[in-house]
Amino acid sequence: MAEGQIIKALSGFYYVLSEGKVFQCRGRGVFRKQKVTPLVGDRVVFTATGEAEGYILEICERQNELVRPPVANVEQAILVFSAVSPDFSAKLLDRFLVLVESKNITPVIVISKIDLLDGGMKETIAQYVRDYRHIGYEVIETSTVTKEGLDELMSHLCGRVSVVAGQSGVGKSSLLNALRPDLQLKTGDISTHLGRGKHTTRHVELLAIAGGLVADTPGFSALEFDHIELDELPYYFPEFRAYGEGCKFRGCLHVAEPKCAVREAAEAGDIAPYRYDHYLSFVAEMKERKPRY
């Protein structure tokens, strides 16, 4: 028996990477009976039945699991947002950060196209970088033109399983191509190298990039907060935690409650006002959703 990690699932076969070698495996029938489906990213115990074939015997406990794309044990999310073209969107970034935090995945913020910055926009982006770093997030400024930040990004990918996410047109494919040129990913679709037509079955594959594994399908294609409870939301704004203990009421939602230390910190500028505004917007959105039974 040996241990490995599923890097691709296709037509009933699971491709397991173990000690630098890939084994084409099938799952045991017991998985079907238990209604358990092995996922790309799963760490598994398998037995080899030949030079490059085998059977999966056991799926190890998952650290986390994404639905879209269907991948398990993601360690970090590379959140790519462009400085310009399209313009940087702090609210969309905050939405991604909440989703990533809720899945117990470490976010790494990558700001792309910084070579296109000039004048006032340069200082605007610099302030965002300071704000997010102050919260405790890792922020990498990159350019595929000047190659700035690429070495730092590679060091974060090394030895980890990552998904890449972010708004469209921000240069996700360009970044991965810069790190591994033989991928030749087309701009606008991280997954074109799989030769998908519009109606073919989507599958996800982990690509070896910079000493780590990167999902070839954009992560977090669903941006709703459906799986998050309202009272959990403050926890996914890390800078709120230090102030939350000082709120008068236990379980304070930091909206309109009296003597709310988080709201006071936002009013004093100790919490970035736009972060607090985005939080209020997300609270309102979650209050409007239909109840789940």
UniProtKB/Swiss-Prot annotation:
- Tell me which EC number(s) this protein carries: 3.6.1.-
- Summary of subunit composition and partner proteins: Monomer. Associates with 30S ribosomal subunit, binds 16S rRNA.
Q: Which gene encodes it?
A: rsgA
Per the record, the similarity remark reads: Belongs to the TRAFAC class YlqF/YawG GTPase family. RsgA subfamily.
Q: How is the cofactor bound?
A: Binds 1 zinc ion per subunit.
Q: A biological process (GO) annotation for this entry?
A: ribosomal small subunit biogenesis
Q: Where does Zn(2+) bind?
A: C247, C252, H254, C260
Lineage, top-rank taxon, reads: Bacteria
Please give the cofactor(s) recorded in the UniProt entry for this protein. Zn(2+)
MF annotations from Gene Ontology: GTP binding; GTPase activity; metal ion binding; rRNA binding
At the top of the EC hierarchy, this enzyme's class is: hydrolase
Protein name, as recorded = Small ribosomal subunit biogenesis GTPase RsgA
